């Protein structure tokens, strides 16, 4: 999945799917998404577009109310998409590392221990696989 460019509305839908974390039918997306700004028909168009781009996939058949429908899940991860966007705008690994440090420094002190643990996990994974 090298180049996935999403529209603003597709990003909204992907963000909802990432946050929800479980496969959903189109009907469930319409019911559970509190801030939806799209119509039923437009959601179906977005689903087809995201499926074509490889960002989501149909993964199951689920019963919703009295009908069965395909359930979709995100294949494209949030981190993967944001990395693509950053690289697409000229960022490299060094710039992303600097941005990560700047981002961490903006956090509240009470969150610092958790952030440092996450960074240590990233470094450990890099040392293992890098």
Task: Kindly label every feature range from the protein language model.
Residues 6-9, 61-83:
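Short, cationic-aromatic polyanion-contact patches
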Residues 37-52:
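Short amphipathic alpha-helical interaction segments
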Residues 51-63:
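A short, conserved structural fragment
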Residues 23-33:
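Short acidic, hydrophobic short linear motifs in intrinsically disordered regions
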Residues 1-16, 20, 77, 89-92, ...:
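Short alpha-helical segments that sit at the start of domains
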Residues 81-127:
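Amphipathic alpha-helical dimerization/coiled-coil segments
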């Amino acid at each position: 999945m090298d180049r996935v460019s999403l529209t603003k509305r597709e990003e909204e839908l992907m963000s909802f799917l990432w946050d929800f974390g479980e496969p959903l039918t189109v009907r469930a997306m319409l019911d559970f998404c509190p801030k939806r700004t799209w119509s039923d028909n437009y959601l179906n168009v977005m689903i087809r577009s995201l499926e074509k781009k490889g960002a989501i996939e149909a993964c199951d058949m689920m019963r919703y109310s009295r009908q069965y429908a395909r359930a979709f899940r995100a294949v494209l991860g949030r981190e993967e998409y944001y990395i693509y966007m950053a690289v697409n705008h000229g960022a490299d690994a060094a710039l992303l590392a600097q941005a990560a440090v700047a981002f961490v420094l903006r956090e509240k002190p009470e969150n610092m221990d958790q952030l440092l643990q996450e960074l240590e996990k990233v470094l450990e994974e890099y040392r293992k696989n890098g």
